[in-house]
Each structure stands twice: as structure tokens, then as C-alpha cells.
Design a protein with these regions (language model features):
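Carbohydrate-binding surface patches
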Residues: 529-566, 610-611
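Solvent-exposed beta-strand/loop surfaces of large extracellular or lumenal domains
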Residues: 92, 104, 171-179, 183, ...
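N-terminal accessory beta-strand-rich subdomains and adjacent acidic, glycine-rich linkers
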Residues: 26-270
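Glycan-recognition and catalytic regions of carbohydrate-active enzymes
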Residues: 115, 500-545, 582-585
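Aromatic- and carboxylate-enriched substrate-binding clefts and catalytic-loop regions
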Residues: 318-477
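Bacterial N-terminal signal peptides
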Residues: 9-18
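An acidic-aromatic substrate-binding cleft motif
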Residues: 244-312, 316
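C-terminal beta-strand-rich structural cap/linker in extracellular carbohydrate-active enzymes
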Residues: 592-618
């Protein structure tokens, strides 16, 4: 890990702006990323408004935008300042290895500083911690103790994101909702984060949140003063002990959508390092849901998992009674015909883990009783159902619950409306979360491709894939389902959500599912247009997996394999849509030798896909 200190770059800039809510200022203090591509600058505008702006390359992606918050009782931190002082910049260059992830090594490389907006009088100035990465910029508010005042009550946050034009925005109004591409000025209400916008010049911008643990979730609403400005909207007030460090507000930008996915480790870098000393019990893997809630079904799922290279089975809602009733007790098995202990013992003998679903009602009431019981039972993980979300109370509760699960060596999957903000780095027993319109919502490929380039910036998503369910033939294809298993990252990958072991009938493409990893050493997005198509390549050891997904228009893409090791021959196993295949899934398989000079021509049908495994062995 390397540190170096630099003098802060200062500049005097006269702006010819006269746009409502995008204010002009004269003196700007600047912090640049290590490669110089990103620059975040600070100044004071009219009425002492604290301002920042962001540049990516030669382009200004965030125009002068307001900062600050308002306390309960009226104390206002959004104006009255006379000066912006940017402290000495520090260069940080380190790396760390995640317990699991999309890459085996994460570089943490940025310039950081603290900016202080000063104002006259006894009130403290507004202080921010700022980082400029090669992939984006981030800042968070710092509030220290003030005399005898040891806490703060924040009513609302006023962080603005003022854009250069009425950009097209990929809007989603709930974490599991459907995306629509609209102008900023056409947003109906507050939208989820990450929020991705596309400029006329082809640049892609993302606004995100990182390290949300004990604070209210940020959403983004259109400003009442400017149709091209988004303003942070907290899900309720915040009460915090001082000193306070808020979650990070993140601005990313790139010249292509795939670069934002390749850079999504930025959110991880903004979270604290792993706090679990012994992580040997944390195990990624593939999952089948047991839909009959029976002993026989559980045993069959274990056998299926062993045969097809899965690592877990899951019992979902109903195993302990009606999840909607408080009278149900998750400390006991109430489902007739289910000997859960027998299934767990059988699974353990076969090195298969058992995951249990518990509704938030019973977790909130009984978590401290449940965890030692589940440890004795020998379960591998918990799926939190219908978690309360958004406000500070339930955000804090959920993170505390995940930390408690770690004490009992229990892994966690969170459903339904929650989206990750990088805290899986700190507690890597937090395996995945929903917060996506996955296969339960039967998304056509155009929605899947919107999710891929928007939601997946936030981190792992439990997509609850279905493979044999009848909806697949209505909105996508089976080859596309295989491709999505590569494109969408989750260390716990639910591959058979509505399916049963009896659904499988010896389909030859199951060789792909058996070989498929769920964690990776490297990620590359080779092609991509939001909502239209994507080609995602992931490496595990010496092998590569390439997922090619397409929306409405049939197309052929050229895929260069120049990322393969030179002077080495591989074998490409390609799984594609084939109406003439003699199976109900209509997946054809072809094999050919390839090397780093190979360029694959990949045809994809409307709402189809192609999955490719490139193996280094014979």
C-alpha cells in the first residue's frame, strides 16, 4: 500500500452559466484522480451555497451543484458559506483480495482529501471527505461533535446532481420494478439508485450510494427548480451520534456502459475491510429451491445437486407455517411431511448446504432465539424475506442482523426491495440480495439487459433463475437463460427457482451448468448497449465463460478472443438457440479449437442468447 501527499490544484474559472439551480461561482479548488480523467471541484456560489462539479476527460458531467442538509428544527447547512478550503491531497494505492467476488484482486487507487466550507459565526462549517478514483468520484459528509451536542437529527439531505442537458435516464421507481428510458424532465417520482443516464454524445453516467449501514437510503428526485437536476431524497429522517460519517455519494462516468460494470468495485472500495476473521465457512455456490416442502423433495434435490454440481438446496416460504401470520414459529417445523433434520443430515453427508427462508416478521421478533437453534440444526444460510427497507431503523436492523448471523457462521441472502451498497466487503457472509426484477417477474430480455447495466453496478443480485418453467419460451430462450447465468453475478446463484429435479430429462447442456462457477477472477464487458444486447466475459482460473444476451432485434456480433493467453490453444463449447435440436429446450452445442487470434461470429435470435465456455483443458 502506498501513500503520497500532493499540493491541491487550484483554479480560477469564470463560468457563463445562467441555468436555474446550476449555479455559477468563480474560485474552484480541484482534486484529480490518479490518471487525471476525473476531477471534482468545489466552490461557493450565490448566497453562500456550497457547490461541487465533476469533469470526466474534457467533459463536465456534473455542473455546479448544491451540497448540504437540513436538521430537524431548522438548522440549515446549505448556505451562508464564504469559502471552500480543500485540504492536502493524499494518494492511496493499495489492493485487497475479497473472500468472493467478480475479481480475485481489487485495486484501491485514489486521491483523497477533506473539503471544508467555512462560514462566519459560531456554527461549524460543512465538511466533506472526498475521493477521486480513475473510475469515478465519491464524497460523504463529516459532522463532528459541537460543544455539548453529541448527536444530530437530519431532516433532509440537499445533495444535487445538475446535468448538462435533459439526458435520457434509465428510470426505475422500485428496486424490483421495470426500467423505462425517459428524459430527466419526464421522471414521475423519485428513482432508485444506481441511476444511469446517457448523454447525446454517448457518455454514460451513474449516480450511486455506497456504505449505507446506519442511515436512511438515498433515492433521487427531480428538482422543482430545474428539470435537469436530481436531488437526494432520504427515506425518512436520520438520528445519529456524533461524530457522523454519512454514506458515500458516488458519480461514475464512462464512454461505454460496460465500463461502469467493469468498475463496480468502486462501491466495494468505499466500504470498510472484512471484519470476519475466519471466513473458511463462507461458501459460494449454485442453488436449487425445493418447491414441495417435503422430506422426499429435499432428498431428491440433494441428489440432483450432487449429480449436477450444485452446492445448496433451499426451503422457501411455508416450511414453518404461514409467513404472513405472527403466530407462525420459525423455531419449529410445522409443515407435515417434512423431516428437516433428516434432510440436513443427508445433505451434510453429501457436502450440500441447506438454506432456509424466514419472513422478516419472525426475524424481527425472534432472531436472537433463531440463530443458536439454526446453528445446532446445521443450516448453511438464511434468506431474509420481505425485509423492511429504506428508513434508518430498518437499514440498521438488517445490517446488525447480518453481523449476528456471522457470529453463528450463517450466510445470508436478502429479499426483496433491498439493493447492496458494497457492505458485502465488510461482512462477506452477506452473499447476495434481490432488489431486481428477476425471473419471478418474467422479464423479457430487454428488461434483463436494462437490469444488467443499471442494477448490477450495485453488486450481486439474486435473479432467481428459472430454466424449465414455461415462461422461458414466451419471453426469452433457454440458451439466453444460460447466458444470463454468466452475465448476472451472484455468489449464491439460484438456478432452479420454480423447477424440480424431475423437470430435468438429460438435457445435454447441463454439462455447462455443472461446470459453471459463481465467483470469478476477472470481468470484461466486450459489447453492450443498455436494454439491447451484451457480451460479458468472466474468467475462473484458466477458463473463460462468455454470456451473450440479445433483446428484440436479431443480430450477429463479432467477439474477439484476444484476452486469451497467447501461444495457447483452448476449446470453445458453445450453447446456442437451435430450433432443430432434438430436446424441448432447443439448445444446440458446438465445439471448436480457439486461441487469442480467434474472432467468433455470434448470431443471436430475437430475445435469444449464446453461452460459451472456453476451457484450457482437453
Amino acid at each position: 500500500m502506498k501513500y503520497a501527499r500532493f499540493a491541491v490544484i487550484g483554479a480560477v474559472v469564470l463560468l457563463g452559466l445562467s441555468v436555474a439551480a446550476c449555479e455559477a461561482a468563480e474560485l474552484w479548488s480541484s482534486l484529480a484522480s490518479p490518471d487525471g480523467m476525473f476531477r471534482i471541484e468545489f466552490s461557493v456560489g450565490d448566497k453562500g451555497k456550497p457547490l461541487y462539479r465533476v469533469r470526466h476527460g474534457e467533459d463536465e458531467v456534473i455542473l455546479p451543484s448544491g451540497l448540504g442538509f437540513v436538521e430537524v428544527g431548522g438548522e440549515d447547512w446549505t448556505g451562508g458559506y464564504v469559502k471552500a478550503e480543500l485540504g492536502e491531497a493524499e494518494l492511496h494505492d493499495g489492493s485487497w483480495r475479497p473472500v468472493w467476488g467478480e475479481r480475485s484482486l481489487v485495486r484501491d487507487h485514489y486521491r483523497g482529501a477533506v473539503v471544508l466550507f467555512r462560514r462566519p459565526g459560531p456554527l461549524a462549517g460543512l465538511k466533506l471527505e472526498v475521493r477521486a478514483y480513475d473510475s469515478g468520484v465519491a464524497f460523504r459528509y463529516l459532522v463532528g461533535t459541537r460543544g455539548e451536542k453529541k448527536s444530530i437529527n437530519i431532516e433532509s439531505e440537499k445533495t444535487e446532481f445538475c446535468f448538462t442537458a435533459d439526458h435520457k435516464t434509465w428510470a426505475v421507481y422500485s428496486a424490483q420494478g421495470k426500467y423505462s428510458k425517459v428524459k430527466l424532465s419526464e421522471l414521475r417520482s423519485s428513482v432508485e439508485r444506481p441511476c444511469v443516464l446517457e448523454t447525446e454524445a454517448g457518455k454514460v453516467i451513474a449516480i450511486a450510494e455506497a456504505a449505507l449501514v446506519d442511515y436512511a437510503r438515498m433515492r433521487l428526485r427531480r428538482s422543482e427548480d430545474s428539470p435537469r437536476t436530481l436531488v437526494s431524497r432520504l427515506h425518512g429522517p436520520v438520528t445519529a451520534a456524533l461524530p457522523l460519517r454519512t454514506p458515500w455519494r458516488v458519480v461514475m462516468a464512462a464512454d461505454r456502459a460496460g465500463k461502469l460494470l467493469e468498475n463496480n468495485h468502486l462501491l466495494l472500495n468505499l466500504n470498510e475491510p472484512n471484519k470476519i476473521k475466519d471466513t473458511s465457512w463462507i461458501r459460494p455456490g449454485k442453488v436449487i429451491r425445493e418447491v414441495t416442502l417435503s422430506t422426499k423433495g429435499g432428498m431428491a434435490c440433494v441428489d440432483f445437486a450432487v449429480e449436477h454440481g450444485l452446492q445448496f438446496i433451499e426451503y422457501d416460504a411455508g416450511w414453518y407455517g404461514d409467513q404472513g401470520k405472527l403466530t407462525s414459529d420459525a423455531r419449529t417445523v410445522s409443515r407435515g411431511g417434512l423431516d428437516l433434520q433428516a434432510v440436513i443430515r443427508y445433505a451434510e453427508k453429501n457436502n450440500i448446504g441447506v438454506i432456509l427462508y424466514v419472513n422478516r416478521r419472525h426475524l424481527e421478533r425472534d432472531l436472537d432465539d433463531l440463530l443458536p437453534i439454526y446453528r445446532r440444526w446445521g443450516i448453511a444460510g438464511l434468506k431474509f424475506g420481505f425485509v423492511q427497507h429504506g428508513d434508518q431503523k430498518w437499514t440498521r436492523w438488517m445490517h446488525e442482523a447480518i453481523a449476528k448471523c456471522a457470529e453463528y457462521e450463517i450466510m445470508v441472502d436478502v429479499h426483496d426491495e433491498y439493493r447492496m451498497t458494497g457492505w458485502e466487503r465488510t461482512y462477506p457472509n452477506f452473499m447476495t440480495a434481490e432488489g431486481i426484477g428477476g425471473d419471478e417477474t418474467r422479464p423479457p430480455n430487454e428488461q434483463a439487459l436494462a437490469n444488467l447495466f443499471n442494477r448490477m453496478i450495485a453488486g450481486p443480485a439474486d435473479h432467481t433463475f428459472c430454466y424449465f418453467n414455461g415462461y422461458v419460451d414466451q419471453t426469452t430462450s433457454h440458451a439466453a437463460q444460460l447466458a444470463k447465468m454468466i452475465c448476472f453475478f451472484s455468489p449464491w446463484q439460484f438456478l432452479f427457482w420454480y423447477d424440480q429435479p424431475s423437470s430435468a430429462a438429460g438435457e445435454p447442456e447441463f454439462e455447462f451448468i455443472t461446470a459453471l462457477p459463481t465467483t470469478w477472477d476477472e470481468l470484461r464487458v466486450l459489447h453492450g448497449k443498455i436494454g439491447r444486447y451484451a457480451v460479458v466475459a468472466r474468467r475462473k482460473g484458466d477458463d473463460w465463460y462468455i454470456g451473450c444476451l440479445n433483446a428484440r432485434k436479431a443480430r450477429t456480433l463479432e467477439v474477439s478472443l484476444d484476452f486469451l493467453a497467447a501461444d495457447k490453444t483452448y476449446k470453445a463449447h458453445t450453447y446456442y438457440d437451435d430450433p432443430g435440436a432434438g430436446t424441448r429446450t432447443k439448445v444446440g452445442i458446438s465445439r471448436r479449437p480457439v486461441d487469442s487470434k480467434t474472432v467468433l461470429s455470434v448470431p443471436m435470435s430475437e430475445r435469444g442468447g449464446v453461452a460459451i465456455r472456453i476451457s484450457s483443458g482437453k
